[in-house]
Regions:
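Iron-sulfur (Fe-S) cluster-binding segments and ferredoxin-like electron-carrier domains
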Residues: 141, 271-282, 305-323
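C-terminal catalytic lobe of FAD-dependent flavoproteins
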Residues: 19, 115, 124-125, 136-263, ...
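Short Fe-S-cluster ligation motifs
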Residues: 292-309, 325-347
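Helical element adjacent to the flavin cofactor pocket in flavoenzyme catalytic cores
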Residues: 10-61
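Hydrophobic/aromatic beta-strand patches that form the interior of the parallel beta-sheet core
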Residues: 32, 63, 196-198
Length: 347
């Protein structure tokens, strides 16, 4: 029997989400991205299909985990039982070496009605961040970073650790919390037959996610009974993380695959072999940000200034598309364009 007492742990939200998607794909699921829900098809007042920008998707039941748009998706189905408004949170991220000696875990202030407060936290990858603040918004697309927000975060963080090295920040960003009208999670069967909501997920949304999943599964099975998949594959292929290996282990890996010897992202020591593996994996990366989230190429101090063009070239080659078709993240987020013939000859 293990006698060590576990007092705490951290996990990477991004890695966890990617792993769940990869597990689903290797068990027969299909992931469709950049796909807008436009309506629902019903028969006898039960949902039978979803209308989308990429065609009709037949469905015995639909789980609505639409984030800040969950209320809009529910309304398309005829469910007006809840509303969602966005609450923006801004963050500042530091270089790995910046605050490593100052922070070893999570430093919390006293929580308030809106949030747990502006905190200081280390990540599983070694960075430190401060944030978030909490600003109620009208626009569900507004993830802008503001000077006022940055001042608020820095002043609050300095109350916890006065000598934070603010000059070592490498990027700022913002995200949106999905706040329900009731202020609570919206979980379970909708008044519309065949629709199940998992909405209004504020903190502690990640911590609650496994329990929320069990609640949704229970509700779905009560509506649409199904057997457990007998040949379910839970284990995912494990690719080596080059930067975590010893020099001897790295040398052996390069002998097997020379692309491990080509470091594309020097800030995070990410190799071409790792990037290719991320592209070819189940639910593989299709964009520059997709590669970044899976491998950390572009997450270092230069924020992709060095490796960004090289990652783009690798994506184009592996996906069999021209460089101008490689996206940063969403539709129309092109990084490169074909030279206009009208520009020929210009200085």
């Amino acid at each position: 029997e293990i006698g060590v007492r576990l007092v705490g742990s951290e996990m990477c939200i991004r890695d966890r989400a990617v792993a769940f998607a990869q597990c689903a794909v290797q068990n027969g699921a299909e992931v469709v991205t950049d796909c807008r829900v436009t309506g629902f098809i019903k028969e006898a007042d039960r949902i039978t299909a979803v209308e989308t920008s990429k065609g009709l998707i037949k469905a015995a039941c639909v789980i609505n985990a639409g984030g800040v748009y969950a209320d809009g998706i529910a309304r398309l189905a005829g469910d007006e039982s809840f509303t969602i408004h966005p609450r923006r949170g801004e963050y500042i991220l530091f270089d790995k070496t910046a605050a490593a000696s100052l922070v070893k875990g999570v430093v919390f202030p006293t929580p308030n009605k809106k949030s747990k407060g502006i905190l200081i936290c280390t990540t599983t990858h070694g960075n430190t961040f401060i944030g978030p603040n909490a600003q109620d918004m009208e626009n569900k697309e507004d993830t802008a970073v503001t000077l006022t927000g940055m001042d608020e975060i820095m002043n609050s963080a300095r109350k916890l650790i006065p000598n934070l090295p603010m000059g070592a920040s490498i990027t700022e960003f913002a995200g949106l919390r999905a706040v329900s009208g009731s202020g609570d999670f919206v979980i379970g069967a909708s008044p519309v037959a065949g629709l199940f909501n998992a909405a209004g997920m504020q903190s502690p949304g990640l911590t609650a996610a496994p329990a929320v999943a069990e609640m949704i599964v229970e509700a779905v099975l009560a509506y649409c009974p199904a057997a457990v998949k007998a040949d379910f594959k839970a284990a995912l292929p494990q690719n080596p993380l080059f930067h975590r290996l010893s020099h001897e282990e790295q040398a052996k890996l390069i002998e097997k695959n020379r692309l491990y010897g080509r470091v594309i992202c020097r800030c995070e020591t990410v190799t071409e072999a790792e990037i290719i593996a991320a592209i070819k994996a189940p639910c593989g990366a299709k964009t520059v940000d997709g590669v970044k989230r899976r491998t950390r190429a572009g997450m270092g101090r230069c924020q992709g200034g060095f490796c960004g063009p090289r990652v783009t070239q690798i994506l184009a080659r592996e996906l069999g598309i021209p460089v101008p078709e490689v996206l940063k993240e969403r539709a129309d987020s092109h990084l490169f364009y074909e030279k206009n013939s009208a520009d020929e000859g210009e200085a």
